[in-house]
Regions:
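The AdoMet/dcAdoMet-binding core of the Class I SAM-like
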Residues: 85-241, 247, 253-254
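C-terminal structured "cap/appendage" subdomains that terminate the fold
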Residues: 1-3, 116-117
Length: 296
């Protein structure tokens, strides 16, 4: 029997499907790595898993990967990058440590909520402070930082002024009897589960109560993966608690970010004085590495 006219469209569809399948196989052979350990080792060729630990609070991972002719490291907490050695992550870690202390001018006691790689704590330690309290929820974060990120934190955990406490940051602020010149929150993205508490009115009010008379609070806000309405909500919530507040935009890397600085009393910012402090030897060198050593 011959081929009927009705069978022709079906035959064409069949050959089209076969052709598409052949193309998929060819592309797969070209672009998928031959080393199938790739899927176990990491997400890009050459990547290594350096650290993996499951805590009650979270799972912590440290990965090392090649980029731009060098090896970078990144720390993940429950699958989210929280700290690392690449330019963008170092920039965030350094600047969020320096900015509030430069604005305060003479801080002596600082509280940092979150430790990450320790880069922010190290930046704070470059200033003439007497005490740095750090609260980190996940014990393995501190362990991983001490082992794999000494090039970022420079062993700041051994600084006699640094006191690292394992626990919930909000609960620590609630129960502590200390008063701080500066309270700052590490780069904790507000969209991820559990992080919203550190951007709430209740948390801001708790921090305000634990500030010294001339104390200031600093809050990091990412501009990526954050819906505009959430961004506006955070700013408005912060301003309700801190009527004297300023917003600082950081344009030095692709991942845009801002910092909210709030105080109990009116805060007058002297940019000439700020520039003088930013030019100081240790601080100036650190800020120059991220292109942020000029206040103008």
């Amino acid at each position: 029997a011959g081929l009927s006219i009705e069978d022709t469209p079906r035959l064409k569809l069949k050959w089209a499907f076969i052709s598409l399948l052949v193309v998929i196989i060819i592309v797969g052979n070209v672009f998928i790595p031959c080393d199938f350990n790739f899927w176990r080792k990491g997400r890009i060729p050459g990547e290594k898993l350096l650290y993996y630990r499951e805590d009650v609070a979270a799972t912590v991972v440290v990965r090392e990967y090649p980029q731009g002719g060098q090896l970078n490291r990144v720390m993940e907490v429950d699958g989210t990058d929280v700290a690392g050695t690449d330019y963008m992550l170092r920039s965030t870690q350094k600047f969020q440590g320096h900015l509030p202390l430069l604005i305060h001018k003479d801080p002596k006691k600082v509280l940092i909520v979150g430790f990450g790689s320790g880069g922010t704590t190290w930046a704070v330690s470059q200033h003439n402070v007497k005490r740095i309290d750090v609260v980190e929820l996940v014990p393995s974060v501190v362990e991983a930082a001490a082992k794999y990120f000494t090039g970022v934190n420079y062993g700041v955990m051994d600084d006699r002024r640094v006191n690292i406490k394992i626990g919930d940051g909000r609960n620590f602020v609630l129960t502590t009897q200390e008063k701080y010149d500066v309270i700052l929150t590490e780069s904790i993205h507000p969209i991820y589960a559990g992080n919203g508490n550190l951007y709430s009115r209740e948390y801001f009010k708790l921090c305000k109560e634990k500030l010294a008379e001339k104390g200031i609070m600093s809050v990091w806000i990412p501009l990526w993966a954050l819906p505009e309405q959430y961004f506006k909500m955070i700013i408005e919530t912060f301003r309700q608690v801190f009527p004297y507040s300023t917003l600082w935009y950081v344009p030095n890397c692709l991942n845009r970010q801002v910092y909210l600085i709030g105080s109990k009393n009116e805060l007058k910012i002297d940019f000439k004085s700020l520039q003088t402090q930013m030019s100081m030897k240790k601080i100036g060198k650190d800020l120059e590495e991220i292109g942020m050593n000029n206040s103008f």
